[in-house]
């Protein structure tokens, strides 16, 4: 008798579940329409996504394979408006490149938006509970401890930066030889990041054959291959991001192995920092013993000696420090290699600065060079390290513009809905940057000072990049020294000229899919 009743019980259960789900959908739809009318919202243009979003998913997948995600989104905005809605695997996502909306997401409505509920489980295997995966009070705690470590007083001396410049110059090939600058940019960025964060650079530019990405001090060489593991893990994290709630389907033993390699690399330094803090905090130590050069990790370990917390924060900061710098530095030479006029102008400015200051030029004076600043900012405008980002609504709310026929009415955003913002598209809008928006023209930065939310290469608001000042100084100094010692830089990129839309590989940050092939000639003397 009991067994015969099971089908009926199951049918009743599934019917009730379906009815409950239908009720929730109808109730949510009614509430959304009511609030939308109350808040004077208008519908946003829909991108043709297909059933369950299969067309949009396929288009983005194809764009990613071709390295054209940024240009594909840009085409979509040009055709359907600066704010649009698309469906991704059943989720309605609003995508915008409006400055007012980006300001709302990152600053003016900061408390209404946060990270996706999937961000932590998506990123946890590599980034743990670091500042890029946390939200709310956990994020506030991380930022409170990390922010003091990025003050101007902690910026290293020009001699520190020059030591890395010399290592990079030694790795450049003979005049006339074709080489890819992107791997060198990543090694330079890794060396400078580990030197600043851990107090000791791994010097991958100095000994690329013996232990390029490992730690020489460890006898078992467990950390060899760190950079490759870091790159692979980031690639998987990006795929988990695109999968939204289905992130758990993207996993593998190789992915888990790569995260262990990264963690062991960082834990080596964390353990040394904790040991260092315990020694200098012992009763017999004098203040003099606590002196020495600034070390980010040692300073952070003075605030907490929680091993997992320190490791997670260091992995997060290392990711941003290495990848952002390498991305921008590579893009600068992609642009300069294609523009001999811009190269000659920059070369003259650098040569004049060296002649005027002899060997005593300072970091501040390097940063004050207008054309160098223009070159850097144009690279950040055209190739932002993080071209696309997103936030999720904590509750039913709105974004300022994007609705209605003219796109100027508020748009209703329901609780849990994702709003993606494209910095790539924002930075290439002709109505903001002029008819030559998709042209590399450093002079525009001497003629035009854009409003704050028209130019956001490092995000903005409370979650703005903490290390942006360090990154700008490092990139400016490295470009200055390379231009100083090189007479010419020419593009040697194979294949058809892709202009300002070369194939780009998007993980958590952006890099050039095919690298940046150059041919150089050193300056005489």
Model-assigned labels for residue ranges:
Residues 115-121, 157-329, 345:
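Cytochrome P450 heme-thiolate monooxygenase catalytic core
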Residues 324-337, 478:
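Short, small-residue alpha-helix embedded
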């Amino acid at each position: 008798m009991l067994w015969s009743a099971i089908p009926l019980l199951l049918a009743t259960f599934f019917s009730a579940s379906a009815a409950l789900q239908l009720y929730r959908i109808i109730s949510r739809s009614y509430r959304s329409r009511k609030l939308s009318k109350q808040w004077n919202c208008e519908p946003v243009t829909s991108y043709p996504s297909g059933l369950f979003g299969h067309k949009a998913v396929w288009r983005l997948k194809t764009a990613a394979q071709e390295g054209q995600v940024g240009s594909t989104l840009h085409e979509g905005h040009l055709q359907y408006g600066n704010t649009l809605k698309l469906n991704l695997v059943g989720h309605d996502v609003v995508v915008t490149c409006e400055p007012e909306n980006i300001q709302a997401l990152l600053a003016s409505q900061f408390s209404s938006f946060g990270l996706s509920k999937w961000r932590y489980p998506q990123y946890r295997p590599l980034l743990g509970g670091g500042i890029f995966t946390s939200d709310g009070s956990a994020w506030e705690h991380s930022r409170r401890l990390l922010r003091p470590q990025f003050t101007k007083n902690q910026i290293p001396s020009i001699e520190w930066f020059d030591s890395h410049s010399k290592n990079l110059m030694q790795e450049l090939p003979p005049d006339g030889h074709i080489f890819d600058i992107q791997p060198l940019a990543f090694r330079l960025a890794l060396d400078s990041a580990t030197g600043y964060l851990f107090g000791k650079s791994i010097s991958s530019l100095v000994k690329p054959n013996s232990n390029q990405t490992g730690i020489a001090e460890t006898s078992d060489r467990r950390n060899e291959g760190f950079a490759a593991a870091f790159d692979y893990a980031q690639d998987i994290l990006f795929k988990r991001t695109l999968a939204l709630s289905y992130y758990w389907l993207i996993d593998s033993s190789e992915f888990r192995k790569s995260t262990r390699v990264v963690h062991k690399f960082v834990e080596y330094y964390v353990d040394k920092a904790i040991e260092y803090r315990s020694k200098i905090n012992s009763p017999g130590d004098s203040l003099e013993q606590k002196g020495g050069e600034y070390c980010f990790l040692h300073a952070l370990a003075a605030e907490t000696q929680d091993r997992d917390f320190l490791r997670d924060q260091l992995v997060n900061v290392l990711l941003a420090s290495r990848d952002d710098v390498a991305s921008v530095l590579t893009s600068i030479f992609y642009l300069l290699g294609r523009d001999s006029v811009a190269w000659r102008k920059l070369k003259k400015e650098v040569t004049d600065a060296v002649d005027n200051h002899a060997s005593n030029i300072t970091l501040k004076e390097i940063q004050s060079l207008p054309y160098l600043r223009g070159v850097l900012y144009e690279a950040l405008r055209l190739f932002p390290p993080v071209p696309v980002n997103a936030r999720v609504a904590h509750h039913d709310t709105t974004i300022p513009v994007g609705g209605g026929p003219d796109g100027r009415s508020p748009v209703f955003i329901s609780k849990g809905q994702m709003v993606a913002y494209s910095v790539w598209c924002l930075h290439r809008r002709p109505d903001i940057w002029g008819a030559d928006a998709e042209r590399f023209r450093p002079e525009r930065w001497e003629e035009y000072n854009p409003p704050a939310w028209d130019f956001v290469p490092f995000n903005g608001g409370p979650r703005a990049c903490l290390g942006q000042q360090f990154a700008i100084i490092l990139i400016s100094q490295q470009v200055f020294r390379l231009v100083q010692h090189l007479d010419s830089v020419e593009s040697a990129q194979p294949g058809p000229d892709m202009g300002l839309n070369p194939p780009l590989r998007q993980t958590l940050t952006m890099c050039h899919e095919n690298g940046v092939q150059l041919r150089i000639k050193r300056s005489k003397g």
